[in-house]
Design a protein with these regions (language model features):
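Peripheral, non-AAA+ core regions of ATP-driven protein-machinery
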Residues: 2-12, 16-78, 85-93, 98-109, ...
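Conserved RecA-like ASCE P-loop NTPase motor core of nucleic-acid helicases/translocases
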Residues: 118-122
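Conserved Walker A/P-loop ATP-binding site and its immediately adjacent core
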Residues: 123-129
């Protein structure tokens, strides 16, 4: 008879302990251990693949340049690095209602319409509910198969029986293995189901996408090892009330990371935004103080976006600082640079900094744009509307060079910008001919003289 024992798992990293601990010794997080009942059976997750296990000389290993499977959605193909790799396991995470299932249904439709067999496995909806949602997207071919199940063994058998080229698991937190006594969505269940799906994908050369729920902190629910096990991790960002959605690749074994795809949620599903820069700048106010346009590199794609700042005298004892779409601590740091190195009296002012369009950016190249937006609002002097700004700012007020200067300038020139304020070091590196007026600055003081 199988024996049951009580173990404790860290919900962040999956570390296992025989007793509860306040702090995880592996990831150093506090209050993350959860209790689970585990049946002592043969260990799963370590089964060998069908390929030979004998060591080989690396020079004898042949690499086949297999053609990727195009999804029919160019923005998704860009994030994946050119399409879906056969035998890969990908994780799609995001807030509820953000559009994860809608996007994967659209991928299934495109693949089925191109005569590729597709299996959509749902543990959250009935076939009738999926059909209702699918009709909003469009017509589906016979190659699209639906299966509503949560048992791991039944799901594995269905995949091996139908042998699809592409399979979707929606969602990983609803699936369970009968070999474990813990509930679906627990650390051990998520880890076991993911390991089983990885074996199925690799052994049968099937591309598998799994949908993952996120916690209130914005990370995929379950152990951190989940993201280490899969080949690709994609995150859907954006507010449910906003029109635009950002698909960001944070891990990709077959392409570059930090690539983004931009979508707009419409009545018939997600629609690609082919020119995000132009879309993000629509409706931008002209001749307004506190408004600047910056260029940020998201992966290999330059994106132009507006930063707005509002600085006004405070009526509170402690001035308010608010940042939307930009790191709050970074804004405070840059305001300290303005006070110390430039002499702006911001200690008695409220400051609000907003990134238009619902985007989130963390690249240091937008530092100079943030500083100029704050100074423009403080002095109530607008920056010329045909000006683009980028550059990293240090604590002593210097403006440092950033990568991708030529790509940023080309993107700005396409959209009709005439002037670019950038680090002097970048001006010296640019070799391409451009009609834009390049204004190089070495420190914050030189930049603010241009307002």
């Amino acid at each position: 008879m199988a024996k049951q024992k009580t173990v404790y798992f860290c919900s962040q990293c999956g570390h296992e302990s025989s007793k509860w601990m306040g702090q995880c010794p592996a990831c150093k997080q506090w209050n993350t251990f959860t209790e689970e009942k585990v049946t002592e059976t043969k260990k799963g997750g370590a089964k060998s693949l069908k390929t030979s296990a004998s060591p080989m000389n690396i020079s004898e290993v042949t690499v086949e340049n297999e053609e990727r499977i195009p999804t029919g959605i160019h923005e998704l193909d860009r994030v994946l690095g050119g399409g879906i790799v056969k035998g890969s396991l990908s994780l799609v995470g995001g807030d509820p209602g953000i559009g994860k299932s809608t996007l994967l249904l659209q991928v299934c439709r495109n693949l089925a319409n191109s005569k590729r067999k597709v299996l959509y496995i749902s543990g959250e909806e009935s076939m009738h509910q999926i059909k209702m949602r699918a009709e909003r997207i469009g017509t589906f071919e016979e190659e699209m198969l639906l299966y509503c199940e949560t048992d791991l063994d039944a799901i594995t058998n269905a995949i091996l029986k139908t042998k699809p080229e592409f399979a979707v698991i929606d969602s990983i937190q609803t699936m369970y293995s009968e070999d474990l006594s813990s509930t679906a969505g627990s650390v051990s269940q998520v880890r076991e189901v993911t390991a089983a799906m990885m074996r199925v994908a690799k052994e049968n050369n099937i591309a598998v996408f799994i949908v993952g729920h996120v916690t209130k902190e914005g990370v995929v629910a379950g152990p951190r090892t989940l993201e280490h096990m899969v080949d690709t991790v994609l995150y859907f960002e954006g507010e449910r009330e906003a029109a635009y959605r950002i698909l960001r690749g944070v891990k990709n074994r077959f392409g570059s990371t930090n690539e983004i795809g931009v979508f707009e949620m419409c009545n018939n599903g997600l629609v690609e935004v082919e020119n995000p820069s132009k879309t993000m700048l629509n409706g931008r106010p002209l001749d307004a103080s506190g408004s600047v346009v910056v260029c940020s590199m998201e992966g290999t794609r330059p994106i132009l976006i507006e930063i707005q700042a509002l600085v006004s005298p405070t009526s509170f004892q402690m001035p308010r600082r608010t940042a939307v779409g930009i790191d709050y601590n970074r804004v405070n740091l840059l305001m300290a640079v303005l006070e110390k190195r430039v002499g702006l009296q911001l200690g008695g002012c409220d400051a609000y900094v907003n990134l238009a369009g619902g985007m989130k950016l963390g690249e240091p190249a937008i530092d100079l744009g943030i500083i100029m937006a704050i100074a423009s609002s403080y002095k109530n002097r607008p920056i010329l509307e045909d000006t683009i700004i980028f550059g990293e700012v240090g604590l002593v007020g210097e403006v440092r060079a950033v990568s991708g200067g030529e790509a940023r300038i080309k993107e700005a020139q396409k959209l009709g910008f005439k002037r670019c304020i950038l680090p002097q070091a970048n001006v010296d590196q640019i070799k391409v001919q451009t009609d834009m007026r390049l204004v190089g600055v070495s420190n914050v003081m030189e930049a603010l003289d241009l307002i």
